[in-house]
């Protein structure tokens, strides 16, 4: 469909024409639009047209569910050749190149740094620890082969999403410059990450640079799409990852219907200064962590991570942190609507 630009919604029903006496409203809801999955013409604004067969599907009837109309061409499951994503090759050199892993002459230094942070905390009294909890670095899996499998699972998801790996916020020409990211602009202020917290985050970054990734597996679910599961026990208050991607002004993305993974970075009093993180081109594992259903008690019970924005050296950063102990094999979830409450989650599992 290239002759007329439209949002590929309101799929026509070729099986019948509406009677002349019907109103335009009845025509739109009962005749002009239909979902091939539920056979309903309701909510025509959420019906997506296949660019090949022109059949309609509700965004929430698709598997996995779509939360917004995608950019460019879209093909229904019958017309699409997309099946289970092809796994990234479990070859060390390819994984090292994909993640740009730095070779370290002595990786034991990283482990000792993590242990020293833990020893410092043990000296703190129980009373003090209750008053001021501290962030923990994640503990990588001990088995190097298992870490390769974990990274290969992430590479599979990134490649299927046509996304390059990045573990930092990126500032590119034509979008928001780094100078725009000033935590001081945050409406109501932003909490400052402590010196020890900054050191803990830096340790997590260093471990990832050396291939000691978080103990997580990216798993493709036919209902939810790519999901993330804990591959070992994770303690409460452990840093899971930083939410990264291209930084842009919110005003540039207000009409981005495909920006379902955008994250608030800066919620400024001046709307022109509001920033978002866009992981559609560059991202890490944060992009694939699932959101809870805010509309059901069962959905809220699944939450095991929280999204927290910190002032780090004057800049806004977003961290995903465990908000309780997480068992091995447990799927990771956090609240997509922690700030603006604008993300549609009513059809989430």
UniProtKB/Swiss-Prot annotation:
Compartments it resides in: Nucleus
Any Pfam family matching the protein: SET
Result for mutant: residue 186 to S/A: Loss of methylation activity
Effect of residue 309 to A: 2% methylation activity on histone H3.1 and 2% methylation activity on histone H3.3
Keyword Transmembrane helix attached: no
Main localization (coarse): nucleus
Annotated GO CC locations: nucleus
SMART domains (alphabetical): PHD
Catalytic activity: L-lysyl(27)-[histone H3] + S-adenosyl-L-methionine = N(6)-methyl-L-lysyl(27)-[histone H3] + S-adenosyl-L-homocysteine + H(+)
Stored InterPro entries: ATXR5/ATXR6 (IPR053114), SET_dom (IPR001214), SET_dom_sf (IPR046341), Zinc_finger_PHD-type_CS (IPR019786), Znf_FYVE_PHD (IPR011011), Znf_PHD (IPR001965), Znf_PHD-finger (IPR019787), Znf_RING/FYVE/PHD (IPR013083)
Phenotype seen when the gene is deleted: No visible phenotype. Atxr5 and atxr6 double mutant is smaller than wild-type plants, shows partial decondensation of the chromocenter, decreased H3K27 monomethylation and increased DNA re-replication.
Bias-annotated ranges (Low complexity): 106-116
Stretches assigned to the SET domain: 214-337
Superkingdom of origin: Eukaryota
UniProt record similarity statement: Belongs to the class V-like SAM-binding methyltransferase superfamily. Histone-lysine methyltransferase family. TRX/MLL subfamily.
Protein name: Histone-lysine N-methyltransferase ATXR6
Organism from which the protein derives: Arabidopsis thaliana (Mouse-ear cress)
Gene, per the UniProt record: ATXR6
